[in-house]
Every structure is written in C-alpha cells, then in structure tokens.
From Swiss-Prot:
Descriptive protein name: Uncharacterized protein ycf68
One Pfam family this sequence matches: DUF2647
Superkingdom of this protein's organism: Eukaryota
Organism: Pinus thunbergii
Cellular compartments annotated: Plastid, Chloroplast
Record keyword Chloroplast present: yes
GO CC annotations, alphabetized: chloroplast
Length: 75
C-alpha cells in the first residue's frame, strides 16, 4: 500500500514528499521536479538509498537529514 506525507523544513521553503512503495520510500521535492530518490527500508540497520536522480543532492542547504526521524520511525 502506498501513502504520502510531507516534511517541511522552516526557513528553507523546501518540502520533501515521501511515498512508500513496496518497502521503499520515494522522496521528491516540491522545489525541484528533477529531484527524486528511493530509500530501501527492507532490512535492519541504516536505510540505503537505492536510486538517485537529483540536482538537489549537491545543494548543501537541502535538509536531507530531516528524514532521519521519519525513516527510523517506519522500521
């Protein structure tokens, strides 16, 4: 079952849109339509990014670490 949610980081104007698909989370941004990645939640330990396609990943101001709480809460 897929579901979606948003994480908003104050001061950055960025939302990361998360959608769970078959044990992985698809991450997209509302500020850059080219940003997307898939995070595998299938096993124990640290979540692993299994696919990247982004210009935002090179931007140090994007709060990618704000996903930590969400990802640790889904496992």
């Amino acid at each position: 079952m897929a579901y979606s949610s948003c994480l908003c980081e104050p001061g950055f104007g960025t939302e990361l849109i998360l959608r769970r698909i078959d044990g992985a989370i698809q991450v997209r941004s509302n500020t850059d339509p080219t940003f997307y990645s898939f995070v595998d939640l299938g096993g124990p330990g640290v979540p692993v990014v299994i696919h990247l396609g982004s210009s935002l990943l090179e931007n140090p101001y994007i709060p990618y670490q704000c996903m930590d709480g969400y990802l640790s809460g889904t496992g």
